[in-house]
Amino acid sequence: MAQSTLYSRVLGTGSYLPPDRVTNQELADRLAKDGIETSDEWIVARTGIRARHFAASDVTTSDLALVAAQRAIEAADVDPQSIDLIIVATSTPDFVFPSTACLLQNKLGIKNGGAAFDVQAVCSGFAYALATADSFIRTGQHRTALVIGAETFSRILDFKDRTTCVLFGDGAGAVVLSASEEPGILGSALHADGSYSNILCTPGNVNRGVIAGSAFLHMDGQAVFKLAVNVLEKVAVEALSKAELASEQVDWLIPHQANIRIMTSTCRKLGLPQERMIVTVDEHGNTSAASIPLALDVAVRDGRIKRGQHVLIEGVGGGFTWGASVFRF
């Protein structure tokens, strides 16, 4: 008797934004106290961002991940003890180690000895984590996975650099995946090119208990934009090819919410109408690895994304990394 094909299927989604919502004008007023000039008009025109959320000083990445995870688990209607794989995509972990995933496993009270680890691919992190969990489930090594993107990027922002500090925010998004004979994730593609590591990075490193060099995010905006618009269309087409789908069969595009100009450019290159693109960058800013699952949860909960529809996600981030997945919700 032939063995049936296993897929990983999205059972539920969840997200969380810290309550401190900071508008462009509020941020501009804060920066003005240090002699840094910016404005709502300047930020909106270049990025599409109108507001972002910042975590309180005593709130960690795992705290944000916990709420998003609880909401995803509730939506999926699964027993937390059945979750035998936890993957957290983050570039702002609570500690160098242990992993944020292990901390989250403990906070959720999961005691089954399942695997838990972090994935670090910056803004591509959720695409990397989702594809990794899908592979584990397809091979039968795990049956139920919790995949999270969570960030406290406000901790690594230089608020004297107006070209970067206005872009990013904090938040978390989560999905629960489960083994299924019904198709869920249909195709994924992941790539990296380390020769571009210097265009988006934190130059400092930990050396004998202190940070050697700058601990703040550095970005060559023009180089990132040029590379992003070049690779995002290609990786999306690659994932669609693996899924044996044409772009016109995509119901919803969820790009990494970095910059509205990059997002609309990719949508246009794929031949998709703009109304099929989920946009949250205006209210969330760039939440790095959290941006895709945050946008996914928003669109699921407001009723736009419905069961049976095809969803294409894609991300690009430091490393340089990029990736995409397409799934039937």
UniProtKB/Swiss-Prot annotation:
A GO CC term assigned to this protein in UniProt: cytoplasm
Pathway listed: Lipid metabolism; fatty acid biosynthesis
Catalytic activity: malonyl-[ACP] + acetyl-CoA + H(+) = 3-oxobutanoyl-[ACP] + CO2 + CoA
Catalytic residues, chain numbering: 123, 256, 286
CDD domains reported for this sequence: KAS_III
InterPro entries, A to Z: ACP_syn_III_C, ACP_syn_III_N, FabH, Thiolase-like
One Gene Ontology MF term: beta-ketoacyl-acyl-carrier-protein synthase III activity
Alphabetic keyword roster: Acyltransferase, Cytoplasm, Fatty acid biosynthesis, Fatty acid metabolism, Lipid biosynthesis, Lipid metabolism, Multifunctional enzyme, Transferase
Gene3D superfamilies: 3.40.47.10
GO BP: any one term: fatty acid biosynthetic process
Region ranges (ACP-binding): 257-261
Enzyme Commission designation: 2.3.1.180
Cysteines joined through disulfide linkages: none
Subcellular location: Cytoplasm
Pfam families associated with the record: ACP_syn_III, ACP_syn_III_C
Quaternary data: Homodimer.
Function: Catalyzes the condensation reaction of fatty acid synthesis by the addition to an acyl acceptor of two carbons from malonyl-ACP. Catalyzes the first condensation reaction which initiates fatty acid synthesis and may therefore play a role in governing the total rate of fatty acid production. Possesses both acetoacetyl-ACP synthase and acetyl transacylase activities. Its substrate specificity determines the biosynthesis of branched-chain and/or straight-chain of fatty acids.
Protein family (similarity comment): Belongs to the thiolase-like superfamily. FabH family.
Record note on domains: The last Arg residue of the ACP-binding site is essential for the weak association between ACP/AcpP and FabH.
Name of this protein: Beta-ketoacyl-[acyl-carrier-protein] synthase III
Organism: Burkholderia pseudomallei (strain 1106a)
Lineage: Bacteria, Pseudomonadati, Pseudomonadota, Betaproteobacteria, Burkholderiales
